[in-house]
Amino acid sequence: MPNPLFDALFAPLAGQDRPLLHLAGGQQLTAAAFVALVERLAAALQALGVAPGDRVAAQVAKSPEALALYGATVAVGAVFLPLNTGYTAAEVDYFVGNATPRVFVGDPADAAALAPVCAAHGAQLMGLSAQGTGSLLDLAAQQDAAFAPVDRTGGDLAAILYTSGTTGRSKGAMLSHDNLLSNARVLADLWRFTPEDVLLHALPIFHTHGLFVASNVSLLTGGQMAFLPGFDLDAVQAALPKSTVMMGVPTFYTRLLDDPRLTRDRVGHMRLFISGSAPLLSETHIAFEARTGMRILERYGMTETNMNTSNPYEGDRRAGTVGLPLPGVDLRLMADGLPVAEGEVGVIEVRGPNVFQGYWQMPDKTAEDLRPDGWFITGDLATRDADGYITIVGRAKDLVITGGLNVYPKEVEEVLDTLPGVAESAVIGLPHPDFGEAVFAILVRAKDAEPDLAAIRAAVDARLAKFKQPKAYAVVDALPRNTMGKVQKAALRQSYADRFKA
């Protein structure tokens, strides 16, 4: 019986005694043991009454058992719904109410807070701890190891992943077996993954990057993973000499650069470093190459689409760009309903087998963002150069319109980030009585120097047109970010909303 995602990612592991997961404590889990765990968890889900199409929500710490729960959900034909482990019970209430999962798997330590939420929405609460214990594992241990996956088609839903955006209510992106599998196959081929690879996996698995990119690609190609519970600098440094590929967010790379242990010898066994989920500063790209001799490969994707573009494996990996559209993915830049010229800013729209099926229980929002002919309006602004490379310049929602003129925050941020005393910056638009919106810059002070605002104003005046220059500045120790490192500009706009009020 076909079950596309299970057949491609999990079934081939059966009977293989090779290591699959290398854990932080030095333990290993073989491929055969892992798939046996998947099958027992699948039987446990069926024992709980989970039927094809039901949702299984998981708010659990990263562990082999948590990854196996994903496989088990796929195996029974249900829809996997991973949730950020940082959400409070009050926040979880929205997701459980919206998705109405049959089963909610949470940390046993949070049971008292989660129980009323699950009861209110008819979800059965089961426990799974970071140590691989809890009521779900107890039930799985009672099940027969033999399990036959449930029939599914490529168009059936495999997951609902809620957007980790920086504005508004999270939306549940519905992803099919074909959405996930087509993207994993393209990336595995493009990035040259083989069974000989060892992926250094320090990402969370409640997000598309850690689960549907990193884990799916590695499982698909039969490699191994150094499966770390999170980014711990010592653990990552220890794993680097034994790994071949690392996927990370920009923060991973800046932390590595701050550590003198990062040397060419340390990464001598590595063939590829990949970055995504948030913009990688050109300075980080350049500094990493200078230190290690290796150029980070940056790519671009979204919860709704998985990956859309990538810098090439062989060829020019251009700092500041997210590369070229993936094979099979159509990408266009639009403004006022028309394609923009080369070098002009437009909203990215994509179409391809990776594009999601719509937003769960949000038909109006789906119709707004997903055209009938398959084009998805991403809301990201970008330019395309003569060679086809895409450069993200920001979110359409972050565009500042001051006195009727458009200001793209990234252009201003790129100037500010090069100035003495500035570690990084965020530029936003704030309500202004004369201009409608005014450009406002939040500067993160550098470790070794305080920003000199007079000098910064002079430097900006020499490099940017008057209308692009910040009307005022704030200096802070850090910017607010979501779990994947994206700056939360909506929070900044709220914090400074009254700055220019008359």
What annotation goes with each model-predicted range?
Residues 181-198, 206-245, 259-261:
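Conserved AMP-binding/adenylation subdomain of ANL enzymes
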Residues 87, 104, 352, 357-358, ...:
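AMP-binding/adenylate-forming catalytic core of the ANL superfamily
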Residues 324-328, 338-369, 405-407:
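Conserved ATP/PPi-binding loop(s) of AMP-dependent carboxylate-activating enzymes
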